[in-house]
């Protein structure tokens, strides 16, 4: 089974429900983290993450891109992944992966609104914003896939979805959200019958609206694909 969760920030030791659930997963499952994994913040942190389940992480904004970019790459799931440690892999922005027959498109990254209080290449990395090359590669891969995907996984969402779901009192322009807006436009323009689900984290909130799901400490299970598309099911576990 495929399970997806939101930001971890290397804080599973301060949680109860999610770590216990992750311990129940096996090598036959897959876990996808929607950015801000946290266990790549320092090299030694990866030694603290020891679950059997193969774990795949989307780029966030509070991630150490020096470690991410220095990790070796290999072919897996039909595209290129970064190998962070045995059993923990980076899903690269702009790529499409095959998870159990599902086409999973990934576009990570987001703007750190607190970057003015952070130190470049110590606690903040400019690579948090996808590049024009990332965007062009995304378009190229989507075109190769005939604009047909099952899951769109990101760290943040489009400007329109952000405004509709969260009603923030401040306005900050995030280039990542603009790129996601355009990518969604392109997908729906070229494939008007697109039935993908869009899952993201970043906002430390839990909300499901139409085809969009914002996750934080929640875990969802991806169901079987039908003519109506995919369904997700929220995993119920003790909170605390």
PLM regions with names:
Residues 1-54, 64-65, 73-75, 147-148, ...:
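N-terminal active-site segment of His-dependent metallophosphoesterases
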Residues 1-3, 95-106, 148-151, 209-214, ...:
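Beta-strand-turn-beta hairpins that frame and shape the catalytic cleft
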Residues 4-7, 31-36, 55-62, 91-92, ...:
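Active-site neighborhood of phospho(di)ester-bond hydrolases with catalytic His/Asp-centered motifs
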Residues 9-16, 37-43, 61-68, 96-97, ...:
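Active-site environment of divalent metal-dependent phosphoester hydrolases
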Residues 23-26, 80-101, 134-149:
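Short amphipathic alpha-helices and their capping/turn segments at secondary-structure boundaries
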Residues 46, 54-58, 82, 86, ...:
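Conserved beta-sheet core of the metallophosphoesterase superfamily
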Residues 100-178:
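Active-site-proximal loop/helix segment associated with metal-binding centers of metalloenzymes
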